[in-house]
Amino acid sequence: QKTGIDMTAALSVSASDSKDSQPAPDGKVGVSKLRTFADTIRDAKTNDLASLKTYLDNNGGGIDTMVKAIEYDYDIVPQIYQSDTSKATVQVSPDQSMKQMEAGFGSGAFGSMVLTNAFYQMPATSSLYTSAYDVVAGSWPSGANQVVLVLDEDGNIPNLFEYTLGLKDHKEFDDLMRSYYQGTLGGKSQSGAQSGTQSGASTATYDYSAILGTTFRRVNAFDKYTWDDTYKVWTDRSSDADYMKKLVDGGQQLTISGIVKPNSDKGGALRQGIAYTPALTYRIIEEAAASPIVKAQRAKPDVDVFTGKT
């Protein structure tokens, strides 16, 4: 990626990272504590991706003889929601529950933090990971409509994922983030506020059957905009609850087809989270390229389609 902040540790907890972490019972998915955020924020870096790709494509340094595969990751974050919209539309990719913190501390750090969530693309080369993981339930995903839940070596997931998966009410996590934000800015020490976020750590376990088959809905970012014929601009409808409910209900369904965990403590090419196939990324790219809003912007590159101004 061009720029980023290393937030992997915030979402990935191994047995060696926490003395409180215990292996999950056989046939169960356990939950480990969410790490404190302050310990995982790193300086953002900028990379020259164009030059790097040219170098790799031309076998720079004889790299073809030293690697099994070269993987490219696109700066695309799927817009994914929980399927149940009966109470509200709950976006889980990118997760919106950190808005209070972003508002208080600025979008620079936490904007990147929000983009690093449970969902991520798995490598296109399956040989990079299949032998390093055991399928404990279901099967590896195939196609753009399936995803896989990746556990740690002890069979656990961070407690954050309980909210993502709908095992706990996502509103609880919203309140947790709000408490963190208010505690930090209200005079409490940062460590004290963080201990509050960890107090919600769960010791629950879940049957594989409670997670396998869980569905989500993906929508296209451009579908959140509709054309305003009066002002001749594209209008953001993401704050329109009725519009968003209809959009999410009709979105692409993603289903957890399997649950996997590393077959050794060395792990593999995957991290804890919900991994989707490259086919989903390609579908998002294709649908975006064919969308009216993108076509309109390309037709008039000097005009901002959101404001109508040059």
Region locations from a protein language model:
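Basic-flanked hydrophobic alpha-helices used for secretion and membrane insertion
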Residues: 1-310
